[in-house]
Amino acid sequence: GFGTGHPDPEHAADAGAGTAPILELRNVSAGYGEVEVLHGVSFQIMPGEVIAVLGANGAGKSTLCGVIAGTVAAGSGELLVEGTEMADMSAHTRARRGVVLAPEARGIFPGLSVDDNLAIRLRTEPGRTEAKERFPILAERHNQTAGLLSGGEQQQLAMAPILADPPAVFIADEPSLGLSPMAANSVFDALAEMTELGTTLILVEEQAGKALAMADRVIIMDLGVVTWDGPAHELDVDRLEAAYLGR
């Protein structure tokens, strides 16, 4: 049920057979120094689900992404991936276990050409060719120094290798930020392709329409707590507006 809000029958059958969540947060609090940003956040995500995390600025969405990826330490609570406690694992260890935070433009080597960047991340010629077919701009700019690309082009260069080997859980924190509409579309196409390959996607996106078009489920946050969690098709306009205005 891609983007319909209904899991497809396969997933539904699995769920009936007691499929374990791929990711579970139990009463997770987190913050920076003395300032707590997340207050007792709990939810489960099933394998293959697409979750849109919505909310006003300051709702704690980026902190949530960081806690799941391991770039922000959880102050308390449990964080389980496929049933394994993960709170003490580094971001690097989590990435090896398949929990990956979308690279920002810093996921590239700015001093090297586009081709050299792809060669480092994609070992095979077919893999590099596929990346350029998926993101034609990388073929056009193949000799250009990566640091001189536009933000959108850098984002596509950072995303390309991940699609060659999609992770189990991909956390995309505002993937369209600063991108032209065309570049944003190619990134969203890439995310959609990932989910079709079975990746569980956690999507934080200012363009709510884009996020909702892809999402099976929506989590709304306000001031560090989850205020709504349900199927995307049940989300009404009033609730959506309230989410962005902070009530």
Outline where the language-model segments fall.
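The feature captures the beta-strand-to-loop junction immediately N-terminal to the Walker
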Residues: 54-56
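Helix-to-loop junction immediately C-terminal to a conserved catalytic motif
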Residues: 69
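ABC ATPase NBD coupling module
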Residues: 73, 85-106, 128, 142-143, ...
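Conserved ABC transporter NBD signature motif
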Residues: 77-85, 97, 125-133, 228-230
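Conserved ABC ATPase signature
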Residues: 145-149, 153
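ABC ATPase C-loop
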Residues: 162-163
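Catalytic Walker B motif of ABC-type/P-loop ATPase nucleotide-binding domains
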Residues: 170-174
